[in-house]
């Protein structure tokens, strides 16, 4: 059976088990999760509050909404769907990195060249060692992750070969965002992650800015506005650093945390700057 048919079959089974339904043939029944707002909700939208810190009481209504959104997102991801999510830098599109059909769907809906890589989102620093060959001290990883950085390292055999097949490297993200960390941990596997926008268009800081993508998504998780929306750095995305060469680092994309990241790499760990090697 092809990966695409397996993913569709997984989606149908999981949808049935949690009471979700498909839309008409050839369409996706997108559902919107968003915090309460005085503004009118979109018709049919489901409203859930996602506390930014995740520090809510176990039995509170806020925790119930948080958990419901997590369970819905995990169900869709395990079924091979694409889900829009908030991160610490921008809104992103996530799918199961193990599902080749879902990876192709991400490229297709963004209009993105398949020669451009997708990052991998994990829930814990300890998970990095499973999916990468790490050549830096553990303290360095913990100083930068979770955070607004993407660390590029040599990939391990654990990752799907259809994920970025053109490079032996992979970019690792652990966003400093409680929902994303909870989601990655509950999913129990690597998530492919990219920005929620059409290629060549501006990145998104709220869900309305990528509303044209909603019909192609299975689920939209609305965590509210990301950042102030005004500063020049707010749409730069994560700082991308190549750590694949021992003792050196390369800045692939300056991003929003360049100064603090390079200070840690050079002043604390003595790494030397080099040319970036990640495409």
Curated annotation (Swiss-Prot):
Residues 21-41 are annotated as: Disordered. It is found in: Cytoplasm; Mitochondrion; Cell membrane. It is a peripheral membrane protein. It comes from the Eukaryota. Its EC number is 2.7.7.87. GO terms for molecular function: double-stranded RNA binding; L-threonylcarbamoyladenylate synthase; nucleotidyltransferase activity; tRNA binding. Belongs to the SUA5 family. Cytoplasmic and mitochondrial threonylcarbamoyl-AMP synthase required for the formation of a threonylcarbamoyl group on adenosine at position 37 (t(6)A37) in tRNAs that read codons beginning with adenine. Catalyzes the conversion of L-threonine, HCO(3)(-)/CO(2) and ATP to give threonylcarbamoyl-AMP (TC-AMP) as the acyladenylate intermediate, with the release of diphosphate. Participates in t(6)A37 formation in cytoplasmic and mitochondrial tRNAs. May regulate the activity of some transporters. This is Threonylcarbamoyl-AMP synthase. The gene is YRDC.
